[in-house]
Amino acid sequence: MTFSVDKVRADFPVLSREVNGLPLAYLDSAASAQKPSQVIDAEAEFYRHGYAAVHRGIHTLSAQATEKMENVRKRASLFINARSAEELVFVRGTTEGINLVANSWGNSNVRAGDNIIISQMEHHANIVPWQMLCARVGAELRVIPLNPDGTLQLETLPTLFDEKTRLLAITHVSNVLGTENPLAEMITLAHQHGAKVLVDGAQAVMHHPVDVQALDCDFYVFSVHKLYGPTGIGILYVKEALLQEMPPWEGGGSMIATVSLSEGTTWTKAPWRFEAGTPNTGGIIGLGAALEYVSALGLNNIAEYEQNLMHYALSQLESVPDLTLYGPQNRLGVIAFNLGKHHAYDVGSFLDNYGIAVRTGHHCAMPLMAYYNVPAMCRASLAMYNTHEEVDRLVTGLQRIHRLLG
C-alpha cells in the first residue's frame, strides 16, 4: 500500500488540537508516541463489553479475555519473528523487562569476578539494573566508549570480552543520538566468547522490522507506548530454552503450579511464571491493536517515509546559526541538539510557545551527557505522523529563538 501521512494523521485525534493558539507539532514520540483511534477504541471496547480477569475462569467473559490475551502474544511473536509465542513475556515496559532479566537470569548466572558489557550511550534502564547486579554479586561492569560522532568505538569491543564475560547488554538504537548499532557483528562476537546478549529495542521496533531469529539475540525487550500503544505494557523476548531455565522474579497468583505451607511452592512453566498477579489485560488488547495498526501500514513503508523526513530535517537544520547537532548522519528517529550556549530547557520552552513539543533534559542518559560535557540537550523525534511542514516550523522556531536570544 502507498503510505499517506495525511491518512495516518487523521487516525490520531490529538494531532488536531492546538497548543498556545497554534497547531500542535508533536516531536516527542521517542519519549512516548501518540495513540491512534484504533488503539483507543480497542481498549475502550474491551473495558465496555469484554472485560474479565483472565486465567482459570470458566465463565464466558473470562475465557474470551484469556483467548484475546494469548492471541496478542501470538501476534507479538510474529511481529518480531520469534520461534514461539511462549518466548514472549508481558512486562510493564522496557525497564521492567531488563530488571526481570537482571534479577532472574542475572542472579542465577553472574558471579563474583564475572563481567557484563554495556555501552556509554545506554539509557539508564540498561545501566542501573546491571550496576545493581554487579554490586550484589561482585561482578565488573565494562563500558564500550563513544566516538564524537555518536557511534561506538567498536574496535575496543574485542578487548572487553574475556572468559568471564557473561552478558553484552546493548541498545538497538540510541534514544539520544539515533545511532543504530551493528547488532549482527556484536552478537556474533559475544556468542564466540560464550556471552549472552540482551538488546534494548525500545527505540527500534517502531522504525523498521525486527527479526529476533535473524539477530540471534538471547533477550530483546521493548515498550509499547513508543509503538503507538498504551502505557504500562511491553514485551520481553527470551530464547525458549533459556527462558525455561530462568527462575521467577516475582511471586503471587498466576505464576504458580502448586502452593503448600508444608511443602513449598512449585512454578508453572514460562512465560506465565514471569507474569505474577492480574495482568494489564486492557493494555495487552491495546498492544494487539497497535501491532495490527503498524503492520497494516507496513513497517518498510514507515521506514522509507521516516528516513526521507529525517534526511530533510537534517538538511534544513543546517540553516540554523549556532546549532550543535549530536549523533551520526545516518540515524533513526531522533535529533538531539543545543542552540548556542542557551540551556535546553529555555529553548524547549520557547518552542512550546510556538506549539512545538520537544523533549529537554538528560534523556535518562547522564553518562552520554557527561561525554559531551553538557547538562542537557533538546531532542526532536520524528515519527510516522510527522510532516515536512512540522520540520519547517521547528527550523523557523529555532531561527527565531536565535534572533531573540542571540
From Swiss-Prot:
Q: Which residues carry this modification: N6-(pyridoxal phosphate)lysine?
A: 226
Biological process per Gene Ontology, one example term: cysteine metabolic process
Question: What catalytic reaction does the record list?
Answer: (sulfur carrier)-H + L-cysteine = (sulfur carrier)-SH + L-alanine; L-selenocysteine + AH2 = hydrogenselenide + L-alanine + A + H(+)
User: What GO molecular function annotations does the UniProt record carry, in alphabetical order?
Assistant: cysteine desulfurase activity; pyridoxal phosphate binding; selenocysteine lyase activity
Q: List locations, semicolon-separated.
A: Cytoplasm
Tell me the InterPro entries matching this sequence: Aminotrans_V_dom (IPR000192), Cys_dSase_SufS (IPR010970), PyrdxlP-dep_Trfase (IPR015424), PyrdxlP-dep_Trfase_major (IPR015421), PyrdxlP-dep_Trfase_small (IPR015422)
Annotated metabolic or biological route of this protein = Cofactor biosynthesis; iron-sulfur cluster biosynthesis
Q: Which residue positions are annotated as catalytic? A: 364
- Per the UniProt entry, the Enzyme Commission number(s) are 2.8.1.7, 4.4.1.16
* Gene Ontology CC, one term: cytoplasm
User: What cofactors does the UniProt entry give for this protein?
Assistant: pyridoxal 5'-phosphate
Listed A to Z, the keywords are: Cytoplasm, Lyase, Pyridoxal phosphate, Transferase
Keyword hit for RNA-binding: no
PANTHER family associated with the record: CYSTEINE DESULFURASE (PTHR43586:SF25)
Q: How does it assemble?
A: Homodimer. Interacts with SufE and the SufBCD complex composed of SufB, SufC and SufD. The interaction with SufE is required to mediate the direct transfer of the sulfur atom from the S-sulfanylcysteine.
Q: What does this protein do?
A: Cysteine desulfurases mobilize the sulfur from L-cysteine to yield L-alanine, an essential step in sulfur metabolism for biosynthesis of a variety of sulfur-containing biomolecules. Component of the suf operon, which is activated and required under specific conditions such as oxidative stress and iron limitation. Acts as a potent selenocysteine lyase in vitro, that mobilizes selenium from L-selenocysteine. Selenocysteine lyase activity is however unsure in vivo.
**What family does the database annotate?**
Belongs to the class-V pyridoxal-phosphate-dependent aminotransferase family. Csd subfamily.
Q: What is this protein called?
A: Cysteine desulfurase
Task: Please give the organism.
Answer: Escherichia coli O6:K15:H31 (strain 536 / UPEC)
* Gene name, Swiss-Prot/TrEMBL: sufS
